[in-house]
Amino acid sequence: MSDFLAYLTSAPSRPHGSANITDKCYDHQLRDLIAYLKQPGVAPSTADINGYLEAISPAVHSLSYLYLLRIRIQQLQEKTAVGVPNDLQPGGTLWNQTVKFLRSFDPIQIRYVGHEWRELVDSVANAALSVSKPILAVKMIRDALERLNTAGVFTSLHLMLVKLALLSSSYTYVLPVLDKLLCHFPSDTQNAHAGILLCSEHEPSTVFFTDSSGFSANLTYRDHLQFYMYSGMVYMALKKWDQASHCLGIVISAPTANSVSKIMVEAYKKWVLANLLGHGKLFSVPNLVAPHVTRVYQSLSKPYISLAEAFEKRDFQRLRTEISLGQTIWRADKNSGLVYQVFEAYDKFLIIKLGKTFSALTMPDVLQRASSCSKGSRDIEEFVVSLVMTKELRAKLSHSPGNETTTMLRFPLSSQSHALREEHIRFRLIQKEAALNTISRAITQTKITLETSHENLQVIAKNQKLAGSSERSGVVGSTEADGGGDLDEDLMGDGR
């Protein structure tokens, strides 16, 4: 046991013993440990594994701990002939050990075993689903992704996480992951020729998440659309309408040749409702959407367009009629709840609109001005109070001097609203700056990747040969010397 334990602890994480060795030496240590653990016959017996798991730390010896966990899961699966043994279910010993690992693993060591790490995360999801408690997996997978830090790379685990969040209605738990910009797909071209060591601490994290690293299953075009569709649904459940509109806008803006997919049409319908609920009106589709695609969306979503028109024109009777006529459609599209919220939001936007015209109104005046409001005289004051308390309506309530029975609704002065707008704009600018910085770093990394790609190096080598040949023959033209003459031909030629 002592010899095997010595191997398990031969490559501790850098903060716990390997801080002073070079990247190259540490890379050799980790690869040697992996090679040893993969040898046939090295796996310890069932009785010994729990002892080893108690003896080593998942934070210090993450590679070894993950290896032992996977061996133990395989042994139990073979013994019980079930996919999720009782010991792996929530509350079991193996579940608790897995929780401990996913909350403390060393992300640098895990770069070497992405496939095995993802399999363990999949096991966690299956275990939670087997007892109908997906919320337990949501917390663990979220923490694991945060710890791993995928640095803006979209993986299959992101899609799994948002699906589990919708299943368990645990929407707020996934916001730390959903709020991060995703700018990359896993790709091998980023480090195919760079010779980057996986243990390097100074390289951008994006180079470690490739389609061969194992951190993600194979991704399809549909996976990308589904992720943003489900993300939009999460934001809608939290009434974060702007974020929902953004995610759904990504889906409806996806490139398409001749026709749109079903998921894109579904996203458009929800996008219409998100705009009505967030801003009380229907915005134009993003500029990336071609005009003919917009026409397809509108033709396939006519009940939603009619609903939006009635809402924008503040035609209450028509709105009720459109909602009633479309009951079957709302249910089939699973949008009944959202349409009901649109109906409830009608009064809110009617009253908010009054603030653009008046500085103060009594409650009877509010009811009179909002003539199509569905509230009665007794309900209107309670409704306005709720809007003010939830900060959906920027206004104050007070009693008129000498008349304590009449409530006055006072809208903010232009100077106050201007200050609020400035604060909102400042906050948005900070958000946009952070997003632009992320995109800028991604562009820089992409530029470096393209410059060191196999295709570009071939072009440079060919152009250098052509330049040398031209110099020897004494006919060096500026275009040929720079390699510009054959650049397009080379890129389009062999296609390698």
Swiss-Prot record:
Instruction: Using the UniProt record, give the first listed, main subcellular location.
Output: cytoplasm
Q: Coiled coil: which residue ranges?
A: none
- Please give one Pfam family short name: COP9_hel_rpt
A GO term (biological process) for this protein?
cleistothecium development
Q: Which UniProt keywords apply?
A: Cytoplasm, Nucleus, Signalosome
> What job does the chain carry out?
Component of the COP9 signalosome (CSN) complex that acts as an regulator of the ubiquitin (Ubl) conjugation pathway by mediating the deneddylation of the cullin subunit of SCF-type E3 ubiquitin-protein ligase complexes. The CSN complex seems to link protein degradation to sexual development.
* Listed name of the protein: COP9 signalosome complex subunit 3
